[in-house]
Amino acid sequence: MFKKKLALIVLSIISIQLSAQYVDFPTQGVDLSKLNLEQFKFGIKLTPAISWLDISHNDAQADGAALKFGLGVSADYEINSILSVVSGVNFNILGGYAFDSVSLNSTNTKNNYQLTYSQIEIPLGLKLKTPEVNKMSYYLQGGVTSGFILGAKEKNKSLTNRAIPSIDMLALSTPSMVGYFAGVGANYKISSKLKLFGEITYKNSLTSVAQSDEYIATNYHNYLQPIEIRPAAMQFSVGLQF
């Protein structure tokens, strides 16, 4: 019963997200009677990450990575013994450092600043796994992601001991983003219904999270040309699958 409810919740969230991203996506309900719930595997995970920015602009430039964090619920639907459809719901914090002429010429703050974005993400992909040997199995996975941006901020560091509040950047950010992921992982079988897993996953945004028109209209950082900001990350996940 718990697995049935969890499957319904995850599938409903995926359907809502796809409906929001793609206007023509059908919105009919999910018929769980057509799905074999024994083929569903769910998991919970913690995801520390190294994240950075890809910036396209005539002034602003990326300037290094930052340590970030995430967590999530994974959902695998096993097609056969080696192939699964993978999805889930993740909360990610992404971002990195950047600099531009305004930050370089500031006399009160350091030369660069940090941009941070928080998002709810829905991945959808395929997992190809090896047979289990001595309780261990390994896999490759990849696919696409879509997500809603929940928050965005810019953080400058003072050259003195004076604290500088973060700047809310949500109004200058897009409401959603689309990207892709690819990674490797391993499972260790603890019991017949419980596995410990670890993953290394590369993620990159295909769409910019910056609303260029808003940057220019508000004269933010004196930008006169459109800016594109695409977050990326290398994630290191550990979790339990049941």
Language-model segments: residues:
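Gram-negative (and chloroplast) outer-membrane scaffold detector with strong preference
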Residues: L32, N36-F40, P48-W52, Y77-S158, ...
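Extracellular loop and loop/strand-boundary signature of outer-membrane beta-barrel proteins
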Residues: G29-V30, D54-Q61, T107-Q114, P165-L172, ...
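Flexible, surface-exposed loop regions and adjacent strand-edge segments
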Residues: A60-A62, V102-T109, N156-I164, D213-H221
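Short glycine/proline- and aromatic-enriched beta-strand/turn motifs that initiate or cap beta-hairpins
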Residues: Q21-G72, G239-Q241
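Bacterial Sec-dependent N-terminal signal peptides
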Residues: M1-T27, V238-F242
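Predominantly the C-terminal beta-signal and adjacent terminal strand-loop region
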Residues: M177-A182, K189-F242
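Short, well-ordered amphipathic alpha-helices
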Residues: Q21, V73, P123-L128, G183-G185
